[in-house]
Amino acid sequence: MQRSPLEKASVVSKLFFSWTRPILKKGYRQRLELSDIYHISSSDSADNLSEKLEREWDRELASKKNPKLINALRRCFFWRFMFYGIILYLGEVTKAVQPLLLGRIIASYDPDNKVERSIAIYLGIGLCLLFIVRTLLLHPAIFGLHHIGMQMRIAMFSLIYKKTLKLSSRVLDKISIGQLVSLLSNNLNKFDEGLALAHFVWIAPLQVTLLMGLLWELLQAFTFCGLAFLVVLAFLQAGLGKMMMKYRDQRAGKINERLVITSEIIENIQSVKAYCWEEAMEKIIENLRQTELKLTRKAAYVRYLNSSAFFFSGFFVVFLSVLPYALLKGIILRKIFTTISFCIVLRMAVTRQFPWAVQTWYDSLGAINKIQDFLQKQEYKTLEYNLTTTDVVMENVTAYWEEGFSKLFEKAKENNNNRKISNGDNNLFFSNLLLGAPVLKDISFKIERGQLMAVAGSTGAGKTSLLMMIMGELEPSEGKIKHSGRISFCSQYSWIMPGTIKDNIIFGVSYDEYRYRSVIKACQLEEDISKFAEKDNIVLGEGGITLSGGQRARISLARAVYKDADLYLLDSPFGYLDVLTEKEIFESCVCKLMANKTRILVTSKMEHLKQADKILILHEGSIYFYGTFSELQNQRPDFSSKLMGCDTFDQFTAERRNSIITETLRRFSLEGDTSVSWNETKKPSFKQTGEFGEKRKNSILNSINSKRKFSVAQKTSLQMNGIEETSDEPLERKLSLVPHSEPGEGILPRSNAVNSGPTFLGGRRQSVLNLMTCSSVNQGQSIHRKTATSTRKMSLAPQASLAEIDIYSRRLSQDTGLEISEEINEEDLRDCFFDDVENIPAVTTWNTYLRYITVHKSLMFVLIWCLVVFLAEVAASLVVLCLFPKILFQDKGNSTKSANNSYAVIITSTSSYYIFYIYVGVADTLLALGLFRGLPLVHTLITVSKTLHHKMLQSVLQAPMSTLNTLKTGGILNRFSKDIAVLDDLLPLTIFDFVQLLLIVIGAVVVVSVLQPYIFLATVPVIAAFILLRAYFLHTSQQLKQLESEGRSPIFTHLVTSLKGLWTLRAFGRQPYFETLFHKALNLHTANWFLYLSTLRWFQMRIEMIFVIFFIAVTFISILTTGEGEGRVGIILTLAMNIMGTLQWAVNSSIDVDSLMRSVSRVFKFIDMPTEDGKPNNSFRPSKDSQLSKVMIIENQHVKKDDIWPSGGQMTVKDLTAKYIDGGNAILENISFSISPGQRVGLLGRTGSGKSTLLLAFLRLLNTKGEIQIDGVSWDSITLQQWRKAFGVIPQKVFIFSGTFRKNLDPYGQWSDQEIWKVADEVGLRSVIEQFPGKLDFVLVDGGCVLSHGHKQLMCLARSVLSKAKILLLDEPSAHLDPITYQIIRRTLKQAFADCTVILSEHRIEAMLECQRFLVIEENKVRQYDSIQRMLSEKSLFRQAISPADRLKLLPQRNSSRQKSRSNIAALKEETEEEVQETKL
């Protein structure tokens, strides 16, 4: 950034905004970059403004019981606000004085008033000076008010952000991210844009009073006729506005539904393509779009009539004021023209300025009250710590996630008793809600310094809540907690802040090379970092999108380990790691590097429990066991079933198993929701073996019993707006649907329907607490890999054993939150936060306009029709101008003039001009009303928007993943939200206003030129100056606006990033650092916005200066050349005064049109994306039948094999190479292998080795080379749809879109209810679906928020069964599954896919044991592909990954594989207690 010229600018330069000339010149000649923008002044700095307002707000909180934020704002900004308001009032007063001088000039041409004729020239000079004074007063005042509004917004932005970092977790659980974004975008933008109008709430009444007094002198009591009409018109416009808002509110719901579905499709585009659902998704969105457009048209018609009413009101107010007076008393031309000028000013004050001012105050006060309520919410309370304490002690602690639960519990219980909803077991009813019970009950333990305590338990047992209570996030209601307070924390869901890898690990702590390298080595990050060209200085944006899930997890762990603390809280840090990496990190990092530190590790792995000093097992919030591992084996031999949350599944009967499935899944389904967190109450049930059978959990479905959603605090569903854990698309990409700018978006669009946050059916929004608990879900494999040669980097860490060193032996210097932030400049912020820079011209090209016009044939005809109507109106005006004087006043000498004439209108030789002016008013009214062209134009433009949306949707759905991988999800969503909103709402009426204003100006110029040809000579250079000035300004303004839009994205992205890592921020005490970073983002946006406001005011001032010159020329030409024509002078000057506002309005509208057309350019850019090649090749022929329709039928054993393809599922892969993006590095190279029909193949490899990539390559979702054949048919010889239908897919990223169960299972409607129920029963979903009202017709929203991750995996499994595919691809199907669902999936795979080829990528050892062959991927290549017995007999990755006990389990399979000629799936023996222990939860 550069130093601002404003600092050294003179008073004159500031007054005329001349200091912006350098940036305007540079923007016209070249493309502006962020470095070209000027630094802001200290008075606009977010630090200073926030400190100022925070000081006044604290003063307000301390001095009053009912603090008011508006009082704090008043003390900060009131006097400057009033100063500019007075200047604005003086500028508006000049408008009221101008008609007086106009009347005097007209009167000077009265033949009976020879005296004033001599001073006409001085009156003309006075009139011109009034315009000059108005220009010099108005623009600085408006700019000053915009500046104050900007400062108020900045101060409140900062205040809200600081408050957000202090909010308690209980409050965050009740606030949606959409509400926070809306608070920062929708509400606070009102200060920027509306503060200049706020003063008109008192200026407009004063101005109306002054004007009515002046009009009284001319028309006496008849003045109130015109005022009454304006008041009625104002109420009419208010009614039309209310009607328009009703349509918009109705449409907002439809827009929201469309955007929710669109967002889900974009986030899950890989799944959509894998399922071949493009056409089904397109049909769903187009149906919603059709309903939306009906309401859009209604709102546009009403808004069009409202806009037209303002234009034609000018004629009627003059007519109603002048006509009664003229009929009774007669009138002279001076009064007519003076009245016209007064009425124009009066119309603006009554119908525009005052209503807008009232609306501004209403919106602003509403926003202030919302912010005030937010600032008074409960804050996070830091626990009292004793720094000298070395142990961690918890004594009889009980805690609730929610306060005041008793009333809610009783109410819900009463409602539930009335409903008596069955859960599938006739002996049980959901009579208890998950309310009232504490999340932790009577917890006591003690950990000595240097000990490792492992915390285990079933899902929802309270493990994460225990850590939150130690950190102070969960306040205990009973008991005591003692520790030193020096805590380090690693979240279960890895959180990456914007910045480099090094910044993420150091995290504001002083840098120490020795410690840093040791941590890097212990966390197995050396090899990963060496692959990046920038090493650990690579900038990570959007939550670490360029990293795999395992890499993010290790960076989060390294951050926790690097900090020197007394207590380390590690919440399931190994969830995304492969078995070997997990084992190495646990031994080298947790056990050796941190050997002298106190550690609490949440885990369920038996190896971890064996090495822990203490073990704490939680069950339903209570301590099930506390002690050592040997004590655990002696005292609790049944502990493994408690870890699982169930007894041996196979021991139950089918009926009892189904009941357990229902109850367990229902328990997990509640964990996916995001409102208030409760633990579960239990009720005795039927008898069954084991302790688990003694009690069963009962619950009420959220969607049935209450509009308010209840959830437990420990979430395993990991849901954020319905998007599940993934290795494909990161969660942040959806959340950059912020106002981009945008969604997300970024992240969210600027339209009101989106900025408020997606509101799903039932009014449910995603809470901030849930956002925090799934901060890195969906962040899986990298899609933008910048890897160098994969040579392992030499370790810089000490070569001694990690057990022999102590990296914490010396205390580093005092941690500082400013150390890193001072090094972060604007370019770093751009790399971390900004969306990709749009590659579109600074000014909309003519090609874009031409292409837009030709999108729909009817638009061209409508534009031609508009031109024909205008030419007819101009021709009629010229005819009237020529014929009226001849027809009405053939005898000029017979005309007389007297003040006491009995005629209503004094007949003079100049009265013909008065009649002509009335006709011009009527013509302009017809032009404004536009009944024969306005409505068709608006209607057609909306139709064009419909066509563009349809084409863009088709283009996105048909685009290859290699193209979509280069785009950010928020950017794609912005096209369907913000840009389509522009095409629907703003562009049609803006084009209409511009065309209308342009024709009015042209008509007025023609009339004036005909009356006085010399004026035409002055008009030509003025119009040329306008065009040149517009072109000069437009290049810079559009670039500044784009930079401002880009600068808005970091603000909202940083807010979301901070919320997702809030627990980590508090644990590390990095709030000041993040506040500083937020202020830098605010300052960056302020620099762009302030410069845009300044250049805009420069342009507006030059426009008025050019007009002042034009008006001076018109005035003196009229006075010096008109002669005795009193009417001629009046009409020329009156039209000239009207041209000023209209022409300036037209120029501004043209700029708005150009700005809005940039949305059209972006839409065209998406429409022009390449498409996937779906054309069949003639080389493909079915073996038995040549009909292509039969090839499209994908069946399995239920249809004769002679009629279908594929028939067996044999796969042959030859030299397969795969890339994610064009020109990127190959993720897989020269992969070759073959799979026999019905064989089960397991994929092995470290995290990020390319296992998921191989599955995507099978589906042709990547840039691939080579060949794959299925049953002898090559993928190049059939269409993509045919190829992908050969596969059944269970992706790692589960896709549940907003719709019914039936639509989610069968979007094309191919299967009957009987078939769907059969499959649902087969996969264990029947009892779950039957719980919901409507059953298959129950509408799932928010990505299936009432379903657990296990439910959703079963939905995917049901889809695969329905597809009857012969090849099944499974990508981490057991990730984050509860044990019951995992058992169901395994059994369904054995039964429904017994004869199918199965390719499995899995981290669970027991799942991999069922495979006959294994494919080992390492360094982008196949390292080994062999049978189980060969893999176990050799030194291989598979042998290293499994324990000796697991190898023994494989003996039956090894023997059976030797005896069988075919590699069919071996029958699995029943689960044993030992297998259960190894299950990873």
Swiss-Prot record:
Lineage: Eukaryota, Metazoa, Chordata, Craniata, Vertebrata
Origin species: Muntiacus muntjak
Gene expressing this chain: CFTR
Location of the region described as Disordered in the Swiss-Prot/TrEMBL record: 1452-1481
Name of this protein: Cystic fibrosis transmembrane conductance regulator
Reported function: Epithelial ion channel that plays an important role in the regulation of epithelial ion and water transport and fluid homeostasis. Mediates the transport of chloride ions across the cell membrane. Possesses an intrinsic ATPase activity and utilizes ATP to gate its channel; the passive flow of anions through the channel is gated by cycles of ATP binding and hydrolysis by the ATP-binding domains. The ion channel is also permeable to HCO(3)(-); selectivity depends on the extracellular chloride concentration.
Binding positions for ATP 1 per the UniProt entry: 401, 457-464, 492
Ranges where the ABC transporter domain occurs: 423-645, 1211-1444
Database matches in SUPFAM superfamilies: ABC transporter transmembrane region, P-loop containing nucleoside triphosphate hydrolases
Sequence ranges on the Extracellular membrane side: 99-122, 217-222, 320-339, 880-918, 1012-1013, 1117-1130
Catalytic activity: ATP + H2O + closed Cl(-) channel = ADP + phosphate + open Cl(-) channel; chloride(in) = chloride(out); hydrogencarbonate(in) = hydrogencarbonate(out); ATP + H2O = ADP + phosphate + H(+)
Compartments, record wording: Apical cell membrane; Early endosome membrane; Cell membrane; Recycling endosome membrane
The keyword Lipoprotein is assigned to this record: yes
Chain positions covered by the region annotation Disordered R region: 653-831
Post-translational modification: N-glycosylated.
